[in-house]
Amino acid sequence: MTPEELSSAVSACLQDAVAAGELTVVDGVDLPEAKVERPKNRDHGDWATTVAMQVAKKVGRSPRDVAQILSERLARVPGVKTVDIAGPGFLNITLDAAAAGGLAQSVVEQGSAFGTGDALAGTTINLEFVSANPTGPIHLGGTRWAAVGDSLARVLQAQGAEVVREYYFNDHGNQIDRFARSLLARARGEAAPEDGYGGQYISDVAQEVLALHPDALESEDPQEVFRAAGVELMFAQIKSSLHEFGVDFDVFFHENSLFEDGQVEKLLEQLRSSDSLYFADGAWWLRSTEHGDDKDRVVIKSDGNAAYIAGDIAYFKNKRDRGADLCIYMLGADHHGYVARLKAAAAALGDSPDAVEVLIGQMVNLVRDGEAVRMSKRAGTVVTMEDLVEVVGVDAARYSLTRYSVDSNIDIDLDVLTRRSNENPVFYVQYAHARTCAVARNAEAAGVRRTDDAGAPQFDAALLSHPREADLLAALGQYPSVVAQAADFREPHRVARHLEALAGAYHRWYDACRVTPQGDGEVELVHHTRLWLNDAVRQVLANGLDLLGVSAPERM
């Protein structure tokens, strides 16, 4: 029995109790769908639900009264061994071995679909992440967003959402001008401007521009030549780095297009006509305090140029016009102020602030030999995506950056990530998957198979009764809810942490329970049955690693 099946059984018991008149619901009041979760204390059963406490007020009864009514009905559900009432109204449910073990067969039969859901079906989500300026290689913070953003997209898709991965290409503004001046200075053999960019990559890009445009220094506007060609070259490198990292985008949106085709000006006129802007001190201001911001924001500066927020507002409207139901922005730690202003901008447009969601990420530090790694050979100032991948590889880089909550600062220990040991989390999980594959190969050689020659399953769920098997089945059963929560809370690290727990449960089971007979012993039904459990673990590990964009090796 899967957790979803048990949850449905609890909900059915609740509806049956209402239909039988044991519980009375006021007209127009909807009862919640019951959900079961794994209790922290295994002595409290296999699964627990708080549904009695959730519905008590709606039916005018105490939580324990509701729990008593539900427990009597649940006890009659096939596969349920015992139902205990605890505390204010918790229902602790223990399944019999056959019902619990049936999960192994269910997982294998569902395959890659196990852990997916439809909670977000029909929802189009625009997920913008990385969006690094094309003025240099992707730094470590952008690398974290690449790993987390792509994993979040996969998790949201696993819950049925249509996700548009979008990269906002900032090719408008002062930073691009500084980049162009830096390239031009290096091409002329001069020092970089005081506010310019340094690093070997500037020299490399400058030389590439000269190779493409030999007469660039003698052109009518050398800086414009270096700006246009340099941005194109740098962005091509960024795209290539992301692709090698396993991250590809559906849309690369050019900021400059918002200004070139008049979207910003049209938007500002719309805001003026709706009295959402006012003129003061020579500038145009957005009445953002009326929509929850801590202060009004300048939209058109006193020099007549648009402030950054003008482009941000136009960009949000553009996303909505393209069909996004929800716009998720993944921004760095220095962008906390954007949350309120983007929501205020949405409200000023007459849109819902709930259509804007901002995730703020914190800093990443690399450590080697106990010391912080601060310099990049190529960039000259910060550690880049290429620096990290060169040392640990794509899998370890993506996994290590995704296994932490984005709102926490993290230290990545390069020494740990290059070790083939259990203290290396990505190795620990990948090795568990490789071990399941090895067990399956050995089982095949020993004549242990999931089905007989006629294709009928060789499986008896009641034989999966060892305590280590109960633990392993519990970890398997939790996986769908972990994925659902990862989507709900925008926290793909939940998947990584659960895979580590599952890998641990599998390694302990491997040490305690044999899939193949010992020595010349005969193959028995328990061996065939355990192969189902082994393969269920393999499937869930593969499914979870895929959500993280990490490979699931068959041999290590």
UniProtKB/Swiss-Prot annotation:
**SMART domains from the UniProt entry:** Arg_tRNA_synt_N, DALR_1
Key words of the record: Aminoacyl-tRNA synthetase, ATP-binding, Cytoplasm, Ligase, Nucleotide-binding, Protein biosynthesis
Q: Name one GO cellular component term.
A: cytoplasm
SUPFAM superfamilies attached to this UniProt entry? Anticodon-binding domain of a subclass of class I aminoacyl-tRNA synthetases (SSF47323), Arginyl-tRNA synthetase (ArgRS), N-terminal 'additional' domain (SSF55190), Nucleotidylyl transferase (SSF52374)
Q: Name one GO molecular function term.
A: ATP binding
Q: What does the subunit comment say?
A: Monomer.
The protein's name is Arginine--tRNA ligase
| PANTHER family for the chain | ARGININE--TRNA LIGASE, CYTOPLASMIC (PTHR11956:SF5), ARGINYL-TRNA SYNTHETASE (PTHR11956)
EC number(s) given by UniProt: 6.1.1.19
InterPro entries per the UniProt record, alphabetical = aa-tRNA-synth_I_CS (IPR001412), Arg-tRNA-ligase (IPR001278), Arg-tRNA-synth_N (IPR005148), Arg-tRNA-synth_N_sf (IPR036695), ArgRS_core (IPR035684), DALR_anticod-bd (IPR008909), Rossmann-like_a/b/a_fold (IPR014729), tRNAsynth_Ia_anticodon-bd (IPR009080)
Q: Report which reactions are catalysed by this protein.
A: tRNA(Arg) + L-arginine + ATP = L-arginyl-tRNA(Arg) + AMP + diphosphate
Cell compartment(s), UniProt: Cytoplasm
| Signal sequence residues | none
Has keyword ATP-binding?
yes
- As recorded in Swiss-Prot or TrEMBL, the protein's gene is named argS
Q: Where is this motif: 'HIGH' region?
A: 132-142
